[in-house]
Amino acid sequence: MKDTIRQLIQQALTQLVNEGVLPEGLTPAIQVENTRDKTHGDFASNIAMMLSKPAGMKPRDLAEKIIAALPVDDSVTKAEIAGPGFINFFQNTQALAGRLDAALADARVGVRKAGPAQRTVVDLSAPNLAKEMHVGHLRSTIIGDGVARVLEFLGDEVVRQNHVGDWGTQFGMLMAYLQENPITSDELSDLENFYRAAKKRFDESEAFADRARGLVVKLQAGDAECLALWTKFKDISLSHCQKIYELLNVKLTMADVMGESAYNDDLINVVNDLKAAGMLVESNGAQCVFLDEFKNADGEPLPVIIVKADGGYLYATTDLAAVRYRSGTLKADRALYFVDQRQALHFQQVFAVARKAGFVTHPMDMEHMGFGTMNGADGRPFKTRDGGTVKLIDLLTEAQERAYTLVKEKNPELAEADLRNIARVVGIGAVKYADLSKHRTSDYSFNFDLMLNFEGNTAPYLLYAYTRVAGVFRKLGKDFSEVEGQIDLQASHEQELAAKLAQFGEVLNSVGEKGTPHILCTYLYEVAGLFSSFYENCPILTADDEAQKQSRLRLAALAGRTLKQGLELLGLETLERM
């Protein structure tokens, strides 16, 4: 509907330019927003205030001329001026009902694919291998997954890239420790304890540390024995990650892994090409790039270190190689990096160097989708009681156990298998939704009690809202698709729910554009709340007549499908019963 109103305004502006009311050459970004008070219309635009100065007119006077020039459209009943010059639009409820009927018949719930399809790289998760995933990996994994799902739904060709840390000192450490302490494959599968023991040895013995670094050099040189051990460690670690991804219902597979090691052969080319471009400068023995736009507090240029003084490469080198691959080989139009916002400067520098060096050979927008930290109740980074890092598997296991206790209290008669399945869906969903519902760039405090609450903007509340819709149709022995008749919006609660359901497409477009799943969470929470009000105030099964009953069933069916589709795009499973 917003697009329709923008088009109507644009046609009116074109007419006013032709009439000489507006000067030629104006290209305003026409903004249309939902109104809060529906008595003053459904949508509002500030276009008259934006153009009053170039038009040389008062905003309200220009608004009158814009309204007079608006083409007639069945979807709008009237437009009127409000306040200093806003133009409020009232939508035709019959036209709205027609759009919702069409959405109910559509496999995509009325959501159109957005513009021309583009290839989008989504860089997400990216744990360092050789040890188990911890809570710090949660946000990149699930936010990236949610945005990737939305972009795919909107028509993008999404290429997921799990840029795992599968190269470097930690592998030399593990190999050196394995040489000292030969163990079986079964024992090696407990990678966390093995890593901890190797790290302790590395920190305590300089001789061991030297051996570990020497093995890294051999690994980088292609030593067959080192490569075989590295492959074993990597495979074990990736299998651990894959179990987490499956538990989280995240669309990441082994085929999406494109780790640091994948770019090894191109690192020397990155260095040589930067050198050929005259961009490399030696500083304290290291090879660096200095860009004028990045300076420290004293106004001195900040270095982007490409090669360390000891000849080693850094993250920037690998990230530059990844940019070349994503632009030159994948031919991506857009690359989204879901990495902690504390890395903002790093990515600003990498992107700037890549552009200046000509590494972006295929036009590609690069965006760092930074995120805040997940903290404990004390507002500090989430830790175990003894100050250690919380394993992600432990967190997810506890979430399921807590959910199991809650579900069993509410439904003690359920079979054990059903209890466990509901606990899994609710527990995992609660952890994911608590994160996804927060603004991506915000820090937040992890709280099991809040996220498992059946009231408020939580996964349990939304899952329950969906089961309420499903329950209506279960009583009738019908599916969402088996409802006849047409939607007829008479009661205010029907109209409010209908107007919200019609916004699904624009909400998804906003998520895809900004990389902010919390917008979708807020929307689904509002849909659930409006459905609850509709359900309580507009009898469905005991409606006044059959036409009203079918209309309300259709509205309920669309609410159910919207909730289910929205939760699926967030990576949350739904339940038919709770």
Curated annotation (Swiss-Prot):
List the keywords (alphabetical).
Aminoacyl-tRNA synthetase, ATP-binding, Cytoplasm, Ligase, Nucleotide-binding, Protein biosynthesis
Where are its TM segments located?
Answer: none
Annotated compartments: Cytoplasm
What Enzyme Commission number(s) apply to this enzyme? 6.1.1.19
Catalysed reaction(s) here are: tRNA(Arg) + L-arginine + ATP = L-arginyl-tRNA(Arg) + AMP + diphosphate
Which Pfam families does the entry mention?
Arg_tRNA_synt_N (PF03485), DALR_1 (PF05746), tRNA-synt_1d (PF00750)
Q: Which GO terms describe its cellular component?
A: cytoplasm
Q: Which GO terms describe its molecular function?
A: arginine-tRNA ligase activity; ATP binding
Cytoplasm recorded as keyword: yes
Q: What class of enzyme is it?
A: ligase
GO biological process, alphabetically ordered: arginyl-tRNA aminoacylation
Out of the domains of life, which is the source?
Answer: Bacteria
Residues forming the motif 'HIGH' region are 127-137
Checking PANTHER family in the record gives: ARGININE--TRNA LIGASE, CYTOPLASMIC, ARGINYL-TRNA SYNTHETASE
- Which NCBIfam families does this one have? argS
**This chain belongs to which protein, by name?**
Arginine--tRNA ligase
Look up and give the organism this protein is from. Pseudomonas fluorescens (strain SBW25)
| Gene assigned in the entry | argS
